[in-house]
Amino acid sequence: MRHYRISDQNPIKTKRLILTPLTAKELAALETLEQDELMRGALGEMRRNVVEYPDRALWHTGWQISLKKGGQAVGLLGFHGVAVEQTVELGYDIFPQYRKNGYCAEAIRALCDWAFRCEGVYFISVLV
């Protein structure tokens, strides 16, 4: 089985964006700052799964979406675990002030391209 460790993954770059997988420490920092209870719970679950399953961490962590120009974080996306029946689920959140710029579609395309190059992934379900 191929390992999907955070330390082995270079950021994914698109024309305007950089997607960077977050470490457990980074997830913990975001979790303490998050105001929304539902999102705080999701960040906590990601952090716990990254620690518990380090060889599959890229399927459990959040990927920060940042602008190439200026480095500003504009959102977060990530998978909801490893593939089940050759399918992974993908969720996302673009911060309100950055919506309607096409960042979400660009980030989803890039992360889906990465996932389809991984062994055992044939389908991706995107959760809105």
Language model features: what each stretch is:
Residues 102-105:
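Glycine-rich acyl-CoA binding loop
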Residues 1-89, 94-97, 110-127:
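GNAT-family acyltransferases
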